[in-house]
């Protein structure tokens, strides 16, 4: 069963990718969806068997590296952390596969798309189930490559190619530091197996542990899109919407957080790394929320929302509340996937337009999409008794419950980030569904026309009928679009994820963060006793600070709605003022981080590369190579040719020098010494060269005199 969890998505990917022409579009969709759905069922069984019964399972397939001083197996382990991570990864992957059947139905490359999706799922399973850092790195690189392939799936679009390359190169920075961290672990302990490394972690020097932790943190920063290495995340929205839901909800972006949780026995012994995680997550939360508030692309707003929630998870890791971070990761995966798929349903209905300023009034035409996006947004802003409420508010309470300067400061910063999260969630819902219609009129005529046709077919049962000539002409002139809600395959994942977004947090909160829970008794998550704050969080935090995020959420939601409905001119006038214009431009351009990177890092590296190419490749190497050799040989040939001056005395001198050299060489060989011979030879050679050069100068002067005389005679 456990091996099937790993292998089935790979088999589906191979069949769809290599035999897509044989099985056809429907066959590729059926095989990949069935393989992932069966894998999901097996993973749920593993969750109950391993998680509730505390029976970790290890599978060793074969030896991968076998040397005298280092052995590593191609092995997998299923502990409580692994099976908990598999739940969101596989459930959302299977729902995205189902959703893509309808969403990508008009695309001519269905087999390739489904092959990439299944391969991505397989690589994520490898990353999560690996029992050593090296095998985990295989999955880590695999999801990076699959992300590149999926973001650039529409490879004829320049923006998609640029975005995929940006994601790939940005993640290489984190991968470089992760590799350095693995080398330091290997140099320190001589092994990369989790069991060996974590059992020896208490005996590692604290400075070495800090270096390892910082390298792992930078690797997680790139993959989980923290401040500094976050620029790839909004650009990755150029891929198809199901890809955004899969990559940026449950899989690739959570890989960095998973790495930190898996390495908890290492980073628990470095307070520096924990403090860095705490502040990095806080800055990321407020930074991304503020940027998301000023974006106009519906998918980019949700992407920055993802970045903000990842910052909350990193805050929980900095507080050593790894179980809370895992709980929030799982909860976030469900409602964020629902937001992305709901956004995809909206985009699908308005002819692929993503600017929500051109939406408005879609509530009546997309009632299911509006309902599920409202549920997901309520869960995102931690509305009471929604899934996100049980984890997000607990992270804020944990920050205050640490009762330190950093903890209270991070609580304040994260609460401000939660306020901005509320504002952009209200903004997306209001401008998309509730505001006055702002889109092109033919979209709404399209909706109304197809609603009438739907009602006619429903009541008469006729599927074939003739339309009036003017209606037929109107339909033919409309752009390609899907009116109203999508079909069964588009709606089913939305309903399932909506149920998860409402009930999952309440059902599982005692399993993951309950004080009496023994779910993590197998030590897959390690919390040092001096860092334990669960009791203080539950019982010592004042009620006011527990309710403060909720109060701010409700207050600012009402303020945003009142300003939009009652005082829209106030917002417009502020935006058109000099201060508002500058503020909007600064935040809309993402704090000008990309400008800074391009100007001071990218251009500097490109200039440095150009100079190195110019000096080394085209300079030193060519000078020492064929170009330089040619110049030296030409110079030597000219020097030798200059010895021929056609003057008899020079030839006599050469003969004399050669004769003397011959005599002294013979004498020196007889006497066993060569010093006098060398000195005399050098002296004579210098005399010869000076004489020949003077003679050549005299010869040139004579030639010039002869030429000038001839010219005078000609005149």
Curated annotation (Swiss-Prot):
Name of the protein described by the UniProt record: NADH-ubiquinone oxidoreductase chain 5
Family from the record: Belongs to the complex I subunit 5 family.
GO biological process: ATP synthesis coupled electron transport; electron transport coupled proton transport
Keywords attached to this entry: Electron transport, Membrane, Mitochondrion, Mitochondrion inner membrane, NAD, Respiratory chain, Translocase, Transmembrane, Transmembrane helix, Transport, Ubiquinone
Molecular function, one GO term: NADH dehydrogenase (ubiquinone) activity
Localization in the cell: Mitochondrion inner membrane
Catalytic activity: a ubiquinone + NADH + 5 H(+)(in) = a ubiquinol + NAD(+) + 4 H(+)(out)
Role summary: Core subunit of the mitochondrial membrane respiratory chain NADH dehydrogenase (Complex I) that is believed to belong to the minimal assembly required for catalysis. Complex I functions in the transfer of electrons from NADH to the respiratory chain. The immediate electron acceptor for the enzyme is believed to be ubiquinone.
Membrane topology qualifier: Multi-pass membrane protein
